[in-house]
């Protein structure tokens, strides 16, 4: 089944701003969140689709690639796109093409081709509490690193790579085709300018080995879902002396049992008994900083919202914390005994004797229905 257009998934125009994208994403994510739609497979699939769309459109580089190439531009399994990293390969491919046509550029004229290491991406899943308060953590990132045995040379210890006999160490050869002289990557040394006659036993002459490296990462307080933390130089090592790439730690916040986040604000559903709604009372509600008291006035209806200022999250760049919004849901009692039902019927009779004084909204609704059918 073909994927839907990501802009269509979020219901925004292709020129939508970052704020418009974020607002649309949060609205749809809250609507289709699995916690709000238990045992609903359709809602679960829609939530995944919405999350996937925002992960692409909410990232400047991925959005540019998607706008130009469609789904293929952001699919790591698409032909020619590569899946290990975000840097180096794509630009270098174009460099190789134009270098072969027009005589080479960027490093070939003075020696072997130099490549910057690929950027790495690491997805880190954290809780809402961790996002709010910040913390330090340790991550293990799979990456290519210089071989310790040969120190990245690719040659067996005690030996050294030799200058390539084909290209003389330049990493490129020039081919004469009629009136044109075309420069190409050396087929013998593959652009390194060196030949390895006795390869390193640890890396088989590659000069790099695959291993997990452990890094300490500081997660700032107030970080939001989809934000990225850049760790300079902790990507994959460069080739032929090129600089290392960067590591991008992308934050994913787990769904919370109570709260939904909207920017720096938090929202929760406050379920109260119908007796408390009618008579009023004091209730304790949870916050990320502990408990708070809410005074429920008499006659509170479902849908009423209580705002607790400063009980939200203080964003990474915010001066003040957001607010907590508690949305009331009045619970109707179930599994009543015969005695309880009799008491309620007696109570209902007393309400009816009072006319519309006790239930003005119900009376108003009844009047509107009568007018509709009259």
Swiss-Prot record:
PROSITE patterns registered for this protein in UniProt: DNAJ_1, DNAJ_2, ZF_CR
Residues involved in Zn(2+) 1 binding: 147, 150, 200, 203
Zinc finger (CR-type): 134-212
Domain J: 5-70
Keyword Cell inner membrane: no
Pfam families attached to this UniProt entry: DnaJ (PF00226), DnaJ_C (PF01556), DnaJ_CXXCXGXG (PF00684)
GO BP terms in the entry: chaperone cofactor-dependent protein refolding; DNA replication; protein refolding; response to heat
Cofactor(s), by name: Zn(2+)
GO MF, one example: ATP binding
Keyword set, alphabetical order: Chaperone, Cytoplasm, DNA replication, Metal-binding, Repeat, Stress response, Zinc, Zinc-finger
Entry's cofactor comment: Binds 2 Zn(2+) ions per monomer.
Localization per record: Cytoplasm
UniProt comment concerning the protein's domains: The J domain is necessary and sufficient to stimulate DnaK ATPase activity. Zinc center 1 plays an important role in the autonomous, DnaK-independent chaperone activity of DnaJ. Zinc center 2 is essential for interaction with DnaK and for DnaJ activity.
Family classification: Belongs to the DnaJ family.
Protein's recorded name: Chaperone protein DnaJ
Organism in which the protein naturally occurs: Bordetella petrii (strain ATCC BAA-461 / DSM 12804 / CCUG 43448)
Protein encoded by which gene: dnaJ
């Amino acid at each position: 089944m073909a994927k839907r257009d990501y802009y269509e998934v979020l219901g925004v125009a292709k020129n939508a701003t970052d704020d418009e994208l974020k607002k649309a994403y949060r609205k749809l994510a809250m609507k289709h969140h699995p916690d709000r739609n238990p045992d609903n497979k359709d809602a679960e699939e829609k939530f995944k689709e919405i999350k996937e769309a925002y992960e692409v459109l909410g990232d400047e580089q991925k959005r540019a690639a998607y706008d130009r190439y469609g789904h293929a531009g952001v699919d790591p399994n698409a032909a020619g796109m590569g899946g290990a990293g975000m840097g180096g390969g794509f630009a270098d491919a174009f460099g190789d093409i134009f270098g072969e046509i027009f005589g080479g550029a960027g490093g070939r004229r003075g020696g072997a081709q130099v490549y910057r290491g690929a950027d790495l991406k690491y997805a880190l899943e954290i809780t809402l509490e961790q996002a709010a308060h910040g913390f330090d953590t340790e991550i293990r990132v799979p990456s290519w690193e210089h071989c310790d045995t040969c120190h990245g040379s690719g040659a067996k210890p005690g030996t050294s790579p030799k200058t390539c006999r084909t290209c003389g160490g330049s990493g490129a050869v020039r081919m004469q085709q009629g009136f044109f002289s075309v420069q190409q990557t050396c087929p013998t040394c593959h652009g390194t300018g060196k030949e390895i006659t006795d390869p390193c036993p640890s890396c088989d002459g590659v000069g790099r080995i695959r291993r997990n490296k452990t890094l300490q990462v500081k997660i700032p307080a107030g970080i939001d879902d989809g934000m990225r933390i850049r760790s300079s130089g902790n990507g994959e090592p460069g080739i032929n002396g090129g600089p290392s790439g960067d590591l991008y730690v992308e934050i994913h916040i787990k769904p919370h049992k109570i709260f939904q986040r909207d920017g720096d604000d938090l929202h929760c559903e406050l379920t109260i008994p119908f007796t408390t709604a009618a008579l009023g009372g004091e209730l304790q509600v949870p916050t990320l900083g502990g408990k708070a008291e809410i005074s429920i006035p008499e006659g509170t209806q479902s849908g009423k919202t209580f705002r607790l200022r400063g009980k939200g999250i203080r964003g990474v760049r915010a001066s003040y914390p957001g607010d907590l919004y508690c949305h009331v849901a009045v619970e109707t009692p179930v599994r009543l005994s015969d005695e309880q039902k009799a008491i309620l019927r007696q109570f209902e009779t007393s309400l009816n004797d009072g006319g519309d004084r006790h239930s003005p909204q119900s009376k108003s609704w009844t009047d509107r229905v009568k007018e509709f059918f009259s």
